[in-house]
Structures are given as C-alpha cells and as structure tokens.
Amino acid sequence: ISDSRRDASLSDDDSFLFILDTYNDQQNGFLFGTNSSAMEYDAQIDNEGNGNRSVSRQQGGVIGGTNLNWDASWDVKSEKGDYGWSAEFAIPLKSLRFNIGKNQTWGINFQRNISKTSETAYWASLPLGFDIKRVSLAGKIDGIDLKNPKNLKIMPYVLMQSIEDKSVKDLDKTD
C-alpha cells in the first residue's frame, strides 16, 4: 500500500527522482520525485545530505541535510499504460535559487526505483553505498542561460478568531 502524502518516502514504490545542483557547488541541491500515483516529493539537500555538523539539534522535518519542510511550488502528472508509467514535471524557475547569467553549468542526476526487482538505477553512476544526494558525483548540464524569474507569488488567506464574553458583571455596584 502506497502512502500518498506529500514528501512520503518513495523507496518502496516504483518511483523517479532527480536532483539539481543549481550552483554547481557539488554540495547542495534541490531534490524532486514522484511515483506512479503522482505524489509530490521535494527537499533541499545540504552538504550532500549530511547537513551542517556544527548544529547540534535538528529541526522537525530536517533529517541530516535533507530538509523536507521545503515545499516548492511545482506540479507533476503521471500516466499509467501498457508500457508501465510515465511522469511529467512542471517546476517554475522561481521555485529554485540559482545564479543569473550565461553559459552556466548545473549538476544533475536521475534515480529510478523499480520495486518489483528491488532495483535502483542512476543516470550518473554512483558507487555502492551512495545515493542521489551525492551531488559531487552528479552529471553536468552546460550552457544554461537564465534570466531572473519574478519571485512573487500571492497566496491570500484569512485567519480569524472570535471571542464573545457572555458573563454578566455588575459594574454599577459600589462597596
């Protein structure tokens, strides 16, 4: 039985993940993933998933250097067919942080989990014992030319509280 909550583990499902090292610092990245039910999984990766060792306590939702509290604005759709399943990701650039300019290089890797055979495959080969968070071993995309995306998103909401005092006080009484 699959867990359909956002950021639930994808390790027991047929799933697809990819990581973007947008600064090409070989340490940090943005991880996105899904399964055949189009569950959204995203996280910020710090220090290849090891986190900041100088910080002694962990924040809820942050495991080592994997910040699951980060919820980017993006969408994924999946389709099942005779061939298996496929997914299409739509990730606005405003959801990511990156340098602006021409001819940039980003790190990237892809991971496919096949639950039936307990197989995990990577696009950029990783030694046994490492996972997709190892951005220092990721492949590279060269020649990226990006302009500054508008980083404005309005999400109106209302939060209200009403308190009514039903007690009766005799304010005219004098002692």
Residue map of PLM features:
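Structural preference for beta-rich elements and adjacent junctions enriched in aromatics
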Residues: I1-D175
